[in-house]
């Protein structure tokens, strides 16, 4: 380890010792994959940040009610906060065993792919991102009016390959499946219209990052552009960004049940301990440092698979797929870096400098200090790049300080955060999970790249667009397969180039945000049609809030 890293750890811990309350409120600085300081990406307007409206936005997405609001504030691992409930394979619960296995650091073989969050105010997948005339305005209506004035139907009959290939991902999909009603495209614009009609605006943060985050590692990376034909034999090119967009929408709207740990917290000013600044609200303390440490090591290090990271009070981290981690020890008594575990481990009897003694689990016998740096993928702007590989991903890093509580057997049983802006909600679909619509079973027959879609696929796809606002899983998966044919995945560079975070471009000022864009809806189950040539009329599509709620509740 370099002397610079050791100095940084010691300096940070000295700052914690001198002014614990201030340090507890510090936002973890962000760096790129090479460790260079960078500005964290955010989807929120400055007004939403200043008013802390982003906290309500996160809470609305989680949609999971914890058991009561009171109870213990001790930092023992709670029932809704167990790493075993999240990870694919839970193997290690002792620091010595983790170190012996060489898992104090780990990096996935390939990073989850970066993509846009496909903002609702730009029409979600209806945004013509490659069209230089598309306004990409903060005003939903300005964007929608442009699409209405320049209809896809006219472009498709123009004979201009350049114009056709600049259509939005949803417009290309509607053309591919022969949907003259443009059901998928209209569904995206309809999402924004309801908010616009109610509030006169659509919040900049509203999008489908909750679909991109799992889709980025549950589905393979599109490696190259794919040209396919419409039923009228019109060639259309789907660029990697277009295919990623469809994958993100699929996972946003029809994803299976999700495994998660942590809970909801919508308190803009949670109660804190006056002496330390530590959050004392039991719901807003999630996730426990012990759970966090065990989840990261056992999921990324052991299971070799990503998971999604969220931090309630850090507007720069929202639904980010994790990619790598590394951690180091420090002595919590002296608050100095230590290279060896036994030097960093202190008994509770000797831990006289413990600032969090009032919150310790009664089963704690030893405490070890940890500094962990976690790498995660952030959003990028879509492009007409012909090929994609991990070198185009945007990777950022955040560093967290905490200590771990060990029992008499030196098993990790809890811990204390040294920062309130810490990971508090982790989630992932099961490894074998598949996002698919209720109509995928009707897509019978096979589809070859050089041929138009079979009629059964077209019928099923149009039904899925109308009733579930989602692309057919079979089509998305085939587009990915076509894009990967004959290609060898490129390993991620080390280090990766400087990431390009994507705060929402807003040519016009974003109006003052409404902290609660819409009342919490009543969850509605995904409609399941009767497999038949002509499905019965489906109920209205659920909003993205309802779909997310249904996923978290396993419905």
Q: What is each stretch, according to the model?
A:
Residues 292-296, 534, 551-555:
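Generic low-polarity alpha-helical segments
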């Amino acid at each position: 380890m370099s002397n610079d890293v050791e100095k940084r750890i010691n300096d940070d811990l000295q700052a914690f010792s001198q002014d614990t309350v201030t340090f507890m409120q510090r936002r973890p600085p962000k760096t790129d994959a090479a460790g260079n300081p960078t500005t964290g990406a955010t989807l929120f307007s400055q007004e939403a940040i200043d008013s802390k409206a982003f906290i309500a936005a996160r809470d609305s997405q989680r949609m999971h009610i914890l058991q009561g609001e009171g109870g213990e504030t001790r930092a023992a691992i709670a029932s809704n906060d167990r790493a075993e409930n999240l990870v694919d394979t839970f193997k290690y619960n002792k620091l010595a065993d983790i170190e012996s296995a060489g898992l104090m650091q780990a990096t996935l073989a390939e990073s989850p792919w970066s993509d846009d969050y496909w903002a609702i105010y730009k029409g979600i997948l209806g945004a013509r991102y490659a069209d230089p005339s598309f306004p990409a305005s903060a005003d939903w209506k300005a964007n929608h009016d442009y699409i209405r004035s320049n209809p896809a139907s006219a472009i498709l009959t123009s004979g201009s390959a350049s114009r056709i290939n600049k259509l939005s991902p949803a417009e290309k999909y509607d053309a591919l499946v022969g949907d003259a009603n443009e059901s998928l495209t209209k569904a995206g614009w309809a999402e924004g219209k309801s908010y616009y009609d109610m509030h006169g605006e659509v919040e900049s943060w509203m999008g489908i990052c909750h679909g991109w985050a799992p889709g980025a590692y549950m589905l393979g990376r599109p490696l190259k552009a794919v040209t396919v034909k419409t039923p009228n034999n019109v060639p259309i090119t789907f660029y990697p960004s277009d295919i990623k967009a469809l994958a993100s929408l699929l996972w946003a709207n029809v994803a299976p049940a999700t495994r998660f740990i942590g809970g909801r917290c919508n308190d803009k000013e949670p109660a804190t301990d006056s002496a330390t600044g530590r959050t004392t609200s039991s719901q807003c303390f999630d996730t426990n440092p012990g759970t966090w440490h065990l989840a990261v090591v056992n999921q990324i290090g052991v299971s070799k698979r990503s998971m999604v990271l969220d931090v309630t009070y850090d507007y720069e981290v929202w639904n980010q797929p994790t990619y790598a981690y590394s951690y180091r020890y420090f002595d919590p008594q002296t608050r100095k870096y230590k290279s060896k575990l036994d030097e960093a481990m202190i008994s509770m009897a000797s831990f006289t400098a413990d600032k969090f003694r009032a919150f310790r689990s009664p089963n704690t016998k030893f405490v070890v200090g940890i500094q962990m740096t976690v790498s995660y993928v952030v959003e990028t702007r879509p492009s007409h790049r012909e090929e994609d590989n991990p070198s185009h991903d945007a990777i950022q890093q955040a560093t967290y300080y905490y200590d771990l509580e060990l029992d008499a057997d030196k098993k990790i049983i809890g811990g204390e955060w040294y920062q309130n802006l810490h990971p508090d909600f982790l989630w992932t679909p099961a490894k074998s999970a598949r996002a698919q619509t209720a109509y995928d079973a009707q897509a019978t027959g096979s589809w070859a790249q050089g041929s138009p879609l079979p009629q059964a696929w077209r019928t099923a796809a149009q039904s899925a667009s109308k009733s579930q606002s989602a692309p057919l899983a079979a089509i998305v998966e085939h587009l990915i397969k076509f894009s990967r044919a004959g290609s060898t995945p490129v390993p991620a560079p080390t280090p990766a180039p400087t990431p390009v975070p994507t705060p929402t471009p807003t040519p016009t000022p974003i109006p003052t945000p409404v902290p609660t864009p819409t009342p919490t809806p009543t969850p509605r189950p995904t409609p399941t049609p009767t497999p038949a040539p002509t499905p019965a009329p489906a109920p209205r599509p659920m909003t993205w809030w309802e779909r997310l709620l249904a996923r978290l509740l396993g419905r």
